[in-house]
């Protein structure tokens, strides 16, 4: 399940983030990579324990958890503190094909999560850079993702994926992982489809329609059956 969520950050928010990040110190992105990923990772990151990364990360989490589409798709239990990276054409930055670690730990908070979903929040507009597509592989082939600044994409952390070489400009993004209350990806996908259907039908039938009430009850009972808290 690959889901795009538009407008997590406003354009003004993105501009503010970019200004703050431009004045910050960056480090080799391999500092947070696993052994296999480090061999193919070429980018820069804000230090994960920096005040800037933590402050901006809190703002992203606040914005995401107020977004109905994100909540419906992810059903988040725990969210890893957002990280920030940049890929510059003049440095030959790219990130070769890899899969994310199954478990991530945060040294500052002691948080450990199972990485069910990966998240990329774009902080550069598509016309600011060439290349830099996020390429995600699944059973149906390869999918290229390059979204407007402020939009994010959710995809299974178990997916092979890569960031193609940036050949012009600079690509800036936030990336992180989350553990969902619905561990099984098929169950999570069905819950999302059901939620989307309920939202569409409720606009035509009204939320107080008896069939809508029954359908909403089914939604909550399925979450009750599958959820891990």
From Swiss-Prot:
PANTHER family assigned to the protein according to its UniProt record, in alphabetical order: PKHD-TYPE HYDROXYLASE YBIX
E.C. numbers: 1.14.11.-
Requisite cofactors: Fe(2+); L-ascorbate
Originating organism: Bradyrhizobium sp. (strain ORS 278)
Sorted UniProt keywords: Dioxygenase, Iron, Metal-binding, Oxidoreductase, Vitamin C
Keyword field contains Iron: yes
Keyword Metal-binding in annotation: yes
GO terms classed as biological process: DNA damage response; intracellular iron ion homeostasis
Enzyme class: oxidoreductase
UniProt cofactor note: Binds 1 Fe(2+) ion per subunit.
Positions bound to Fe cation: 98, 100, 161
Name of protein: PKHD-type hydroxylase BRADO6316
Residues where 2-oxoglutarate binds: 171
Source taxon at top rank: Bacteria
InterPro entries: Oxoglu/Fe-dep_dioxygenase_dom, PKHD_C, PKHD_hydroxylase, Pro_4_hyd_alph, Pro_4_hyd_alph_FE2OG_OXY
Recorded GO MF terms: 2-oxoglutarate-dependent dioxygenase activity; iron ion binding; L-ascorbic acid binding
NCBIfam families: PRK05467.1-2, PRK05467.1-3, PRK05467.1-4
Source species taxonomy: Bacteria, Pseudomonadati, Pseudomonadota, Alphaproteobacteria, Hyphomicrobiales
Fe2OG dioxygenase domain boundaries: 78-180
